[in-house]
Amino acid sequence: MDSLYLVMPAYNEEENIAEVVRAWYPVLDGKDEASRMVVADSGSTDGTHSILEELRTEFPKLEILSDTDKQHGPKVIALYDYAIQHGATYIFQTDSDGQTDPAEFEAFWNLRERYAGIFGFRKERGDGKIRAFVERVVCLLLGLYFRVTVPDANAPFRLMRAETVAKYLPRMAPDYNLPNIMMTTFFAYYGERIRFRKITFRPRQAGVNSVNVRKIIGIGWKALGDFRAFRKEMIADGKGDNA
């Protein structure tokens, strides 16, 4: 039976984390006994970590990573690596802010044998027009830099074969801040069998997003240099339909 590692980063999510864990934990029902929910919480200054520790008594397959970088991207990388090292067959990543809907997971799971990666597509977003615009710009840049066409590169709703993630994860430094964007790009660039499926993306359920517009601009500016470096490496290796 296929094992699933459901992974999510968390940072100062005391208002959301208990509800999110309770909503997503049932996804593990019917999966291999080795399946786990893993939350990376490092750097939180509120009660997120203590709430997670309390939840572990209620949910025995819940595990906590507390020794990662506090930033979102490095946490995602650490979670992917943890799942791979512990023998996951599939990795599903989402966020801990309550914006995604667990009811939409099963449709992804049912397609798992046909694709190396199934990625959420946020056709409508509840987190504002600015973020939707940024995502469109990102997808445009990926087309320019890597000649890939993707409708949503960064959606925190993705089911991937762990063995495929393991092929590309070493290409990113442990502290890289946009791993999901590049993971989507790698899958598309190297011709992995992928599918995008529309998902619901609600407004943040509580709390404050730790990444504001100013940070987004700074991250985006740095990303241009990162994309150039990745493209140079990808062309040099001579692989993929777009090389």
Place the predicted regions along the sequence by residue.
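Hydrophobic helical membrane-anchoring modules
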Residues: 1-3, 171-243
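Short loop->beta transition adjacent to catalytic acidic/histidine clusters or analogous donor-positioning motifs
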Residues: 2-4, 25-38, 47, 60-62
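Short, well-formed alpha-helical segments that are part of the catalytic scaffolds
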Residues: 13-28
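Conserved donor nucleotide-binding strand/loop of the catalytic core
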Residues: 38, 49-86
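A conserved acidic beta->alpha catalytic loop
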Residues: 41-50, 98
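Acceptor/aglycone-binding surface of glycosyltransferases and processive sugar-polymer synthases
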Residues: 67-82, 90, 102-177, 204-214, ...
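Short beta-strand-to-loop acidic/aromatic patch adjacent to the donor-nucleotide binding site
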Residues: 88-99
